[in-house]
């Protein structure tokens, strides 16, 4: 329980690491898009990073006994203004940076790869904490609504991150 309390206290502080990624390479806000984004399972699979990603390992026997940063990949609304609502904002650097900082400043063991999941992914329920960026223009598909509802009612945590201003 102490680890969970510490984690919940540190997340607001570490969320700044996500915001710090806003003006990395590519378009402002880290909006560069690569086709690999649609099929990647981890942030490390993407061939492009603004800085070399940090590397660390965990003991092999504890591969499933770690915190895993899990980003939700979703459709972009066709009605959104340019750049609004894209799930890949600050990806992959923010995922790797937050995971590294959690590993660095807490006693948590953190998966160095993180995950990218769709809400319909059967593995969703293996991750108690999921991250969704730019939900201001979120439009869930009919099949995603009951899955997300069940995930949340079963104790899953959704962090919704939106830095675009008051209009959202």
Give, region by region, the residue ranges found by the protein language model.
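Bacterial N-terminal signal peptides
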Residues: 5-16
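Aromatic-Pro/Gly-enriched surface loop or interdomain linker
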Residues: 20-129, 133-136
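N-terminal secretory signal peptides that target proteins for export/translocation
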Residues: 1-2
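Alpha-helix boundary/interfacial micro-motifs
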Residues: 19-20, 145
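Short alpha-beta junction capping motif
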Residues: 69, 129-168
């Amino acid at each position: 329980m102490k680890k969970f309390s510490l984690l919940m206290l540190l997340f607001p502080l570490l969320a700044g690491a996500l915001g710090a990624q806003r003006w990395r390479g590519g378009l402002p806000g880290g909006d560069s898009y690569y086709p690999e984004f649609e099929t990647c399972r981890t942030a490390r699979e993407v061939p492009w990073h603004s800085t070399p990603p940090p590397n660390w390992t965990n003991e092999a026997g504890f591969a499933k006994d770690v915190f895993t940063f899990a980003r939700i990949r979703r459709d972009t609304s066709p009605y959104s203004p340019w750049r609004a609502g894209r799930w890949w904002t600050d990806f992959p650097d923010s995922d790797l940076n937050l995971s590294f900082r959690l590993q660095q400043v807490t006693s948590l063991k953190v998966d160095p790869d993180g995950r990218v999941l769709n809400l319909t992914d059967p593995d969703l329920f293996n991750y108690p904490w999921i991250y969704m960026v730019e939900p201001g223009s979120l439009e869930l598909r009919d099949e995603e609504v009951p899955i997300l509802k069940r995930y949340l009612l079963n104790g899953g945590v959704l962090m919704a991150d939106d830095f675009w201003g008051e209009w959202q």
